[in-house]
Each structure stands twice: as C-alpha cells, then as structure tokens.
Amino acid sequence: MNILFAVSECVPFVKSGGLADVAGALPKELKKLGVEVRIILPNYSLIPQKLRDGCTLHKVINVPLGWRNQYCGILKGEQDGITYYLIDNEYYFKRDSLYGHYDDGERFSYFSKAVLECIPHLDFEVDVLHSHDWHTAMVNFLLREKYQDNPSYEHIKTVYTIHNLQFQGVFSPEVMYDLLELGDEYFHSEQLEFYGNVNFMKGGIIASDQITAVSPTYKEEIQYEFFGEKLDGLLRKYNDKLSGIVNGIDTSVYNPETDSYITAQYDADSLYEKNENKRALQRYFGLPEKEDTPIISMVTRLTKQKGLDLVRTVFREIMEEDVQCIILGSGDSEYEQFFEWMAYEYPEKVKVYIGFNEELAHQVYAGSDLFLMPSLFEPCGLGQLIALAYGTIPIVRETGGLNDTVQSYDEETGEGNGFSFTNFNAHDMLHTVLRAIEFYHDKPVWDQLVKQAMTEDYSWEKSALAYKKLYKSLME
C-alpha cells in the first residue's frame, strides 16, 4: 500500500501550525503498520540548509501553468526512514514566509500541478494520494478532472483532510481560468465557484474519494452553520464520504520520560520530579518558588479562535486566587498587549513570553499544573494532548478535538482527565478554573487525576490504524 502525502508544510522541514506536526508524525506511525508513505512539499528557502543538503536532485521536469512551462526540480531525501520529495522553484518558494503573499493562488496552483506532473517520475507507484487543507486541495480536483484518463493516474484514489475549515484558499476566477486552465463549466456553485471567486478547499471536498476531519466532534460541527464557514451545506451533501479521525502526538518528541528539553525527566510514578520542573520554570520566569501555588499556563497562538476574549474578561478575577500564570505565544497585537499589561500589573503572578521557543514550551508543559485552552473552535488541538502526556491538567471548552480528548473529572466516580465547560461564556470558564483550583488543593485526588492523564495513550497508533483502514477500503 503506497501513499503519497501532498502537504504545504511538514516537521522537521518547516512549520507554521498543527498541519506540519501531523505531516511529520503520521507517516512514521503508518510505516510501523506496513504502509509505505512518502511526502511531497515545496522546497522553501526557509527549510534549514542542513536538511536541504541531505537531498539530491532526482529529476528536472517542466510544469505547464497557463501559457507557460515552469521549471520544477524534484529533490529527494530521507528523514527518520521516510522518503521526502521537495519541489524546487525559487520564484515561488524563495520567500520570507510560507503564506500570505499576493500570489498565493498562483504559488499553490503551481505546486498542485507540480505534484501531479511529478508522479510518473517518482519511481513510486502511488495507490492513494492524500492531500491536506486548501494548499493541496486542488491536487485531488485536478487529478479527477484532468489526469484520470492517463494510465499513470487512473488507479489512484484520493483522501482529503480538513485541518482547519477557516482557511479555504479563496482566489479570483483568473486563477482557475488562466493558471489551471479550467473552463466556465467549473465556475458555478456545484463546482469551484464561491461567492464570485474560486475556492480551492471546495475543490478538494467535491473531488476526493474520502474526506477526513481531524476529530469526530469537528466532523459533526462543520456540518452546522456556526462552524461551517459557508461550506456546511456542501459538507452535509458529501456527508457519506466524511469521517473524523482524531490526531495524536509524536511521542518521540513529547514524552516526559525522555524529553531532553526539560529539567527533570519523570513519569506517572515519579511526580516529585514534575515538581522539580515546576521550580525550574518559576526560576526561569522569576516567579516566587511556591510549590502549593498552581501554575496555569497557555501555549498558544494569541488569536480570537483560542478563546482569549473569555480569558481577558475574567483574568483579574482569576488573579484574585493564589495562582501563577504563564503565557507563551504570539499573534494579534491586542492580546499580546493585554497579557504584557497583566504581567506589568501582577509582576509576582503573571509572566509572558511573546514569540515561540520550542525548548521553553516543553518546560512550560512539564512545569505547569493546569493548561488553559478555552477555544471558540478547535479542529483537534495538540496543546491539550501534550499537556495530558506531561500530567498538566487541561481546562478546555467542549468543542472539536477538545471534546474528544478531554473527559471532565467526575468526583463521584473519579473518572476523567481534565476539566471542561460547554458554553462560550467567560463566567462558565471562570467557574471551571475555580473548580480545578479547588481539586488541585486536594492532593490525593489531584495526584490520581494526574496519573490518569499520564497513563492514557495519546500517540498516533490508534489514528494511524484508522487511516490504514480508510486507505484499504478505497483499494478494495
């Protein structure tokens, strides 16, 4: 079974979000199950030179794009036992950021066509082409509409994964006509047309043999208007080929027993070492070293989606409690400035790191007691899974993957691995935070809760089995 992942980002090459984590970890887990997965992505200038140096030039081809033929170098390399192909074209990929350029429609039209034009030259018989998010959605659409009659492609099945429905790749009709050479028959509501523009993600949904969302709850949510980003009707129409498979975490990267980034390695039976990480975290940020004061942390993009309006509304009420708060992330200036002001107002209780620091993030996960993630919506979420693996108890809103992975603590049965609330309401969140703090001070209960969180399986194994089953069903 041969699978080709077409992605716009992938760990360890480049990362802007959770898509890169999935693209980096899932193929390794699938390989353990006997599935041969190879990955194709752009050769961005942002990829570390040492990783590019590990690749060799496999072949040079031309990619037809509108009236032009564009250069396409196919670089080939291996990382952690997985074969990668990097699509080389400096005009499109020698940029200072992955996305957000005036010509993104052209860049990813080129990449989509390049993926398809490369397939006969990869020395790899592709059974299933698995595309991800808007950037590669048109790979599946073009395969069905333009390449399916070619013997090199006619047997290939397609899977399309929605990581975040909010970003759809909406461009002017000229992208469809001039670059992809698709005619008027594709510019209507049953095809690519979307409020006067063309929508790449819509193409992926329409044309793929199977669609997955990154959690079962998100799969249901996106079929409703509130979460559907104007594609809910289309997703209801194609419900029969839509499924939800929750993400995992790469346990070779996120494992408190082996993590080289944290001060003291530990497991569920050596929680005293977790306290050593807490002290180290307090020292790093210059917080008072109080073992009995819970640290509430957030490692997040500072955006509206992450529920920061709720946090902002009741933050001072949380500060009335004996707590410490650590924020690590960057994003919208209004939230950055708010948390910086709170750090100024509560210097003994609040510390903020604007930006991202991988090593520090691991220490925050290991040294915190509670992890706050009150998202407005959350397709899957990795933060809560990492927190759980490190015995840092999540407080989440019941949406998307948060609902699928965090079970609210039940004091009657002792079951659960975190705390959750349903409504997008600041005082519901505050009540849940206060409830979590109350249980934190009940040490026997808390230690049991932490052990329950740490002993569950958050790896990719179950998810990889589900994907393997999906691929197999397409080939039968």
Curated annotation (Swiss-Prot):
Pfam families registered for this protein in UniProt: Glyco_transf_5, Glycos_transf_1
Cystine crosslinks: none
One GO molecular-function entry: alpha-1,4-glucan glucosyltransferase (UDP-glucose donor) activity
Known pathway: Glycan biosynthesis; glycogen biosynthesis
One of the GO biological process terms: glycogen biosynthetic process
InterPro entries, per database record: Glyco_trans_1 (IPR001296), GS/SS (IPR011835), Starch_synth_cat_dom (IPR013534)
SUPFAM superfamilies named among the record's database cross-references: UDP-Glycosyltransferase/glycogen phosphorylase (SSF53756)
Protein name (database record): Glycogen synthase
Gene name as annotated: glgA
